Amino acid sequence: MHLSSPALPIGGFSYSQGLEAAIELGLVHDEASTLAWIESQLVTVMARAEAPLWCLLFEAWRAGDDAAAHGWNQWFHASRETRELRQETEQMGRSLARLAQELGWGTAATRAAVAALRPATLPAVHACACAMWALPREAGLGAYVFSWLENQVAAAIKGVPLGQMAGQRMLERLRAGLPAVLADARARAGATPPRLDTFAPQYAMVSARHETQFSRLFRS
Protein backbone atom coordinates (compact mmCIF):
# COMPACT_ATOMS: atom_id res chain seq x y z
CA MET A 1 0.00 0.00 0.00
CA HIS A 2 2.86 2.36 0.81
CA LEU A 3 4.44 1.89 -2.61
CA SER A 4 1.16 2.56 -4.44
CA SER A 5 0.28 5.65 -2.40
CA PRO A 6 -0.17 8.91 -4.37
CA ALA A 7 1.58 10.60 -1.42
CA LEU A 8 4.82 8.75 -2.21
CA PRO A 9 7.31 11.59 -2.85
CA ILE A 10 8.56 10.50 -6.27
CA GLY A 11 6.76 13.05 -8.46
CA GLY A 12 4.25 10.84 -10.28
CA PHE A 13 1.61 13.57 -10.16
CA SER A 14 3.67 15.75 -12.53
CA TYR A 15 3.55 13.32 -15.48
CA SER A 16 0.76 12.32 -17.88
CA GLN A 17 2.76 9.98 -20.19
CA GLY A 18 1.44 11.57 -23.36
CA LEU A 19 -2.15 11.98 -22.19
CA GLU A 20 -1.87 15.78 -22.13
CA ALA A 21 -0.72 15.79 -25.76
CA ALA A 22 -3.60 13.47 -26.70
CA ILE A 23 -5.96 16.01 -25.13
CA GLU A 24 -4.31 18.85 -27.07
CA LEU A 25 -4.70 16.89 -30.33
CA GLY A 26 -8.37 16.17 -29.66
CA LEU A 27 -7.86 12.41 -29.33
CA VAL A 28 -9.09 12.65 -25.73
CA HIS A 29 -11.90 15.09 -25.00
CA ASP A 30 -14.51 13.49 -22.72
CA GLU A 31 -15.04 10.59 -20.32
CA ALA A 32 -15.55 7.98 -23.05
CA SER A 33 -12.48 8.95 -25.07
CA THR A 34 -10.39 9.20 -21.90
CA LEU A 35 -11.42 5.71 -20.86
CA ALA A 36 -10.63 4.37 -24.34
CA TRP A 37 -7.17 6.01 -24.30
CA ILE A 38 -6.20 4.70 -20.87
CA GLU A 39 -7.55 1.20 -21.63
CA SER A 40 -5.51 1.15 -24.83
CA GLN A 41 -2.30 2.08 -22.99
CA LEU A 42 -3.10 -0.45 -20.26
CA VAL A 43 -3.48 -3.45 -22.58
CA THR A 44 -0.61 -2.51 -24.91
CA VAL A 45 2.14 -0.38 -23.35
CA MET A 46 1.65 -1.63 -19.78
CA ALA A 47 0.51 -5.25 -20.19
CA ARG A 48 2.88 -6.19 -23.01
CA ALA A 49 6.09 -4.54 -21.85
CA GLU A 50 6.28 -2.57 -18.61
CA ALA A 51 4.33 -4.98 -16.38
CA PRO A 52 6.10 -8.18 -17.56
CA LEU A 53 9.39 -6.31 -17.34
CA TRP A 54 8.53 -5.47 -13.72
CA CYS A 55 8.03 -9.22 -13.08
CA LEU A 56 11.43 -10.04 -14.57
CA LEU A 57 13.08 -7.37 -12.44
CA PHE A 58 11.32 -8.60 -9.31
CA GLU A 59 12.47 -12.19 -9.88
CA ALA A 60 16.03 -11.04 -10.54
CA TRP A 61 16.18 -8.97 -7.35
CA ARG A 62 14.57 -11.72 -5.31
CA ALA A 63 17.11 -14.24 -6.60
CA GLY A 64 20.00 -11.90 -5.84
CA ASP A 65 20.90 -11.74 -9.54
CA ASP A 66 22.10 -8.14 -9.73
CA ALA A 67 23.47 -8.60 -13.25
CA ALA A 68 20.08 -9.67 -14.60
CA ALA A 69 18.36 -6.81 -12.77
CA HIS A 70 20.81 -4.31 -14.24
CA GLY A 71 20.31 -5.81 -17.70
CA TRP A 72 16.53 -5.52 -17.57
CA ASN A 73 16.86 -2.00 -16.16
CA GLN A 74 18.91 -1.03 -19.21
CA TRP A 75 16.41 -2.76 -21.51
CA PHE A 76 13.55 -0.73 -20.10
CA HIS A 77 15.45 2.54 -20.36
CA ALA A 78 16.32 1.81 -23.99
CA SER A 79 12.65 1.07 -24.75
CA ARG A 80 11.54 4.60 -23.79
CA GLU A 81 11.12 6.20 -27.20
CA THR A 82 11.16 9.89 -26.29
CA ARG A 83 13.30 12.13 -24.13
CA GLU A 84 10.35 12.94 -21.84
CA LEU A 85 9.61 9.28 -21.14
CA ARG A 86 13.27 8.58 -20.38
CA GLN A 87 13.51 11.58 -18.08
CA GLU A 88 10.29 10.57 -16.33
CA THR A 89 11.43 7.07 -15.43
CA GLU A 90 14.90 8.33 -14.48
CA GLN A 91 13.57 11.01 -12.13
CA MET A 92 10.98 8.76 -10.47
CA GLY A 93 13.43 5.88 -10.17
CA ARG A 94 16.07 8.15 -8.66
CA SER A 95 13.57 9.60 -6.18
CA LEU A 96 12.34 6.18 -5.07
CA ALA A 97 15.94 4.95 -4.70
CA ARG A 98 16.72 7.97 -2.53
CA LEU A 99 13.66 7.24 -0.39
CA ALA A 100 14.73 3.60 0.05
CA GLN A 101 18.19 4.77 1.08
CA GLU A 102 16.88 7.34 3.56
CA LEU A 103 14.44 4.90 5.17
CA GLY A 104 16.92 2.02 5.21
CA TRP A 105 14.84 -0.44 3.21
CA GLY A 106 16.44 -3.84 2.64
CA THR A 107 20.09 -4.67 3.16
CA ALA A 108 23.05 -2.41 2.59
CA ALA A 109 24.16 -4.66 -0.27
CA THR A 110 20.80 -4.37 -2.04
CA ARG A 111 20.71 -0.61 -1.59
CA ALA A 112 24.21 -0.45 -3.06
CA ALA A 113 23.07 -2.52 -6.05
CA VAL A 114 20.20 -0.08 -6.63
CA ALA A 115 22.56 2.89 -6.29
CA ALA A 116 24.74 1.33 -9.00
CA LEU A 117 21.93 1.40 -11.59
CA ARG A 118 22.88 3.80 -14.37
CA PRO A 119 20.32 5.23 -14.70
CA ALA A 120 17.83 3.82 -12.19
CA THR A 121 14.41 3.36 -13.81
CA LEU A 122 11.15 3.35 -11.89
CA PRO A 123 10.16 -0.31 -12.48
CA ALA A 124 13.64 -1.48 -11.47
CA VAL A 125 13.62 0.38 -8.17
CA HIS A 126 9.95 -0.36 -7.43
CA ALA A 127 10.45 -4.09 -8.06
CA CYS A 128 13.52 -4.05 -5.84
CA ALA A 129 11.62 -2.33 -3.03
CA CYS A 130 8.93 -5.02 -3.21
CA ALA A 131 11.58 -7.74 -3.12
CA MET A 132 13.26 -6.00 -0.15
CA TRP A 133 9.98 -6.16 1.74
CA ALA A 134 9.43 -9.82 0.71
CA LEU A 135 6.07 -8.92 -0.84
CA PRO A 136 4.35 -11.51 -3.03
CA ARG A 137 5.00 -10.80 -6.70
CA GLU A 138 1.27 -10.48 -7.43
CA ALA A 139 0.81 -7.85 -4.72
CA GLY A 140 3.76 -5.77 -5.90
CA LEU A 141 2.78 -5.98 -9.55
CA GLY A 142 -0.82 -5.06 -8.75
CA ALA A 143 0.34 -2.06 -6.73
CA TYR A 144 2.60 -0.89 -9.56
CA VAL A 145 -0.07 -1.11 -12.27
CA PHE A 146 -2.86 0.36 -10.14
CA SER A 147 -0.63 3.29 -9.20
CA TRP A 148 -0.13 3.93 -12.92
CA LEU A 149 -3.90 3.77 -13.48
CA GLU A 150 -4.62 6.22 -10.68
CA ASN A 151 -2.05 8.65 -12.05
CA GLN A 152 -3.54 8.50 -15.54
CA VAL A 153 -7.05 9.15 -14.23
CA ALA A 154 -5.83 12.02 -12.04
CA ALA A 155 -4.07 13.58 -15.05
CA ALA A 156 -7.27 13.28 -17.10
CA ILE A 157 -9.35 14.94 -14.38
CA LYS A 158 -7.02 17.94 -14.48
CA GLY A 159 -6.37 18.03 -18.21
CA VAL A 160 -9.65 17.26 -20.03
CA PRO A 161 -11.05 18.34 -17.49
CA LEU A 162 -13.38 15.79 -15.90
CA GLY A 163 -15.26 15.64 -12.62
CA GLN A 164 -14.30 13.51 -9.64
CA MET A 165 -17.24 11.14 -10.21
CA ALA A 166 -16.16 10.59 -13.80
CA GLY A 167 -12.73 9.69 -12.47
CA GLN A 168 -14.18 7.16 -10.05
CA ARG A 169 -16.34 5.60 -12.78
CA MET A 170 -13.28 5.17 -14.96
CA LEU A 171 -11.26 3.65 -12.14
CA GLU A 172 -14.07 1.19 -11.48
CA ARG A 173 -14.13 0.13 -15.13
CA LEU A 174 -10.35 -0.07 -15.41
CA ARG A 175 -9.97 -1.98 -12.15
CA ALA A 176 -12.32 -4.67 -13.46
CA GLY A 177 -9.88 -5.41 -16.27
CA LEU A 178 -6.79 -5.56 -14.07
CA PRO A 179 -6.80 -9.33 -13.36
CA ALA A 180 -6.58 -10.12 -17.09
CA VAL A 181 -3.82 -7.54 -17.58
CA LEU A 182 -1.77 -8.92 -14.68
CA ALA A 183 -2.26 -12.50 -15.89
CA ASP A 184 -1.07 -11.52 -19.37
CA ALA A 185 1.97 -9.78 -17.89
CA ARG A 186 2.91 -12.82 -15.79
CA ALA A 187 2.54 -15.14 -18.79
CA ARG A 188 4.73 -12.92 -20.95
CA ALA A 189 7.41 -12.73 -18.26
CA GLY A 190 7.34 -16.50 -17.79
CA ALA A 191 7.80 -17.35 -21.47
CA THR A 192 11.16 -18.46 -22.87
CA PRO A 193 12.33 -16.01 -24.04
CA PRO A 194 10.11 -13.41 -22.36
CA ARG A 195 7.47 -12.03 -24.75
CA LEU A 196 8.02 -8.29 -24.47
CA ASP A 197 6.35 -6.03 -27.04
CA THR A 198 6.93 -2.27 -27.15
CA PHE A 199 5.14 -1.59 -30.46
CA ALA A 200 3.01 1.52 -29.79
CA PRO A 201 3.76 4.06 -32.55
CA GLN A 202 0.90 6.45 -31.79
CA TYR A 203 1.95 6.60 -28.14
CA ALA A 204 5.52 7.47 -29.13
CA MET A 205 4.45 10.14 -31.62
CA VAL A 206 2.05 11.77 -29.16
CA SER A 207 4.75 11.78 -26.49
CA ALA A 208 7.22 13.36 -28.93
CA ARG A 209 4.73 16.10 -29.81
CA HIS A 210 4.30 16.91 -26.13
CA GLU A 211 7.97 17.86 -25.90
CA THR A 212 7.29 20.99 -27.98
CA GLN A 213 3.68 21.64 -26.91
CA PHE A 214 3.27 25.35 -26.16
CA SER A 215 1.16 25.18 -22.99
CA ARG A 216 1.59 22.28 -20.56
CA LEU A 217 0.56 21.25 -17.06
CA PHE A 218 2.61 18.04 -17.05
CA ARG A 219 6.22 17.11 -17.69
CA SER A 220 5.32 14.25 -20.07
UniProtKB/Swiss-Prot annotation:
Required for maturation of urease via the functional incorporation of the urease nickel metallocenter. One of its GO terms (cellular component) is cytoplasm. This is Urease accessory protein UreF. InterPro entries: UreF, UreF_sf. It is found in: Cytoplasm. One of its GO terms (molecular function) is nickel cation binding. It holds the Pfam family UreF. PANTHER family: UREASE ACCESSORY PROTEIN F (PTHR33620:SF1). UreD, UreF and UreG form a complex that acts as a GTP-hydrolysis-dependent molecular chaperone, activating the urease apoprotein by helping to assemble the nickel containing metallocenter of UreC. The UreE protein probably delivers the nickel. Keywords: Chaperone, Cytoplasm, Nickel insertion. Coiled coil: none annotated. The keyword Cytoplasm applies. Belongs to the UreF family. Signal peptide: none annotated.
